């Protein structure tokens, strides 16, 4: 008899883990709260560093889960720990007795309207990174011939007042990627990036930063934006301080893009509350061991993959999903031997 594995969350981590568990011979039940699989990847256009299509990447991931029991628009209604299994009642009325559970609930984006000084939801010209990516994906750009566009890094990240002092890890690279892409669409526009510190830490990240400056002429201003105001002509005046020169600056823009950071998924936290999963100070879930067992929760048979334990890049998420599948396989086999 095949062991049942419940995977909660149908983003990249859930898809990759489900595919690996299916190949190992397990009966995988994958649930996703949205109407479509893919999580945030389903809303993206091109991916860093190679500019590959997010659509094609998602298609490759979903092709691998053929044969997996997959339920969209479904959430965990109740979850209980039994002896060495989990009893889950799903919102579609199905009950699952799972030998192991993988939580891959991903992340939520910070609600940019909470930073009122930036004017999101107030001024038409202020959008988020997700809004811009949607425009790229749908090929419906919001402006005709803009003269200047700005990007604000760390919106809702590294911000005590916003309740998140931690770095969201991917925002700097995403901002630089999108700044380059916006120059491809509007080559005559001036593009500015307002940043605290540029954290271009991964392979090819520094190359992208240099390319942004040398090939696209993007201006990087180290400093916090303090105020955004709409002018009579509908353009935006941005006040900031250039911390390298210690001088206040004002820039007039046609559009301002806010790089909204990652926050813990509320859907994931709802699951966690049902079985008292522990979280870190930032709200993301705690692993059994942050070095040796990051995919394991502190409960037997309950595992994590992806951004539910903290901000991650897509490659890191996929690597972690494969690792989580192996950890689940080892756990099941060890339990089988004990019986």
Regions found by a protein language model. Name each.
Residues 1-339:
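Residues forming the flavin
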């Amino acid at each position: 008899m095949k062991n049942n594995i419940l995977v909660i969350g149908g983003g990249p981590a859930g898809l990759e883990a489900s595919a690996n568990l299916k190949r190992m011979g397990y009966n995988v039940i994958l649930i996703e709260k949205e109407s479509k699989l893919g999580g945030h990847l389903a809303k993206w256009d091109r991916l860093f560093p190679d500019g590959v299509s997010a659509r094609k990447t998602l298609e490759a991931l979903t092709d691998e889960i053929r044969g997996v029991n997959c339920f969209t628009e479904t959430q965990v209604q109740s979850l209980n720990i039994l002896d060495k299994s989990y009893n889950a009642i799903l919102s579609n009325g199905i009950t699952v007795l799972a030998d192991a559970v993988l939580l891959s609930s991903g992340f939520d984006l910070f609600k940019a309207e909470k930073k009122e000084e930036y004017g999101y939801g107030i001024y038409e010209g202020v959008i988020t990174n997700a809004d811009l990516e949607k425009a790229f994906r749908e090929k419906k750009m919001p402006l005709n011939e803009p003269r200047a566009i700005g990007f604000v890094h760390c919106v809702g990240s590294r911000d005590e007042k916003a309740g998140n002092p931690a770095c969201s890890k991917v925002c700097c690279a995403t901002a630089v990627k999108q700044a380059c892409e916006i120059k491809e669409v509007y080559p005559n526009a001036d593009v500015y990036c307002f940043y605290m510190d540029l954290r271009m830490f991964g392979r090819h990240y520094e190359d992208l930063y240099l390319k942004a400056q040398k090939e696209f002429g993007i201006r990087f201003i180290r400093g916090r934006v303090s105020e955004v105001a709409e002018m009579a002509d509908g353009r935006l005046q941005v006040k900031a301080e250039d911390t390298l020169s210690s001088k206040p600056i004002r820039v007039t823009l046609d559009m301002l893009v806010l790089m909204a950071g990652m926050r813990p998924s509320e859907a994931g936290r709802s699951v966690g509350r049902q079985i008292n999963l522990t979280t870190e100070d930032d709200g993301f879930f705690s692993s059994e061991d942050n070095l040796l067992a990051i995919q394991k929760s502190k409960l037997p048979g309950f595992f994590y993959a992806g951004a539910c334990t903290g901000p991650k890049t897509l490659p890191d998420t996929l690597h972690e999903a494969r690792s989580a599948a192996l950890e689940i396989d080892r756990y099941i086999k060890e339990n089988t031997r004990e019986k």
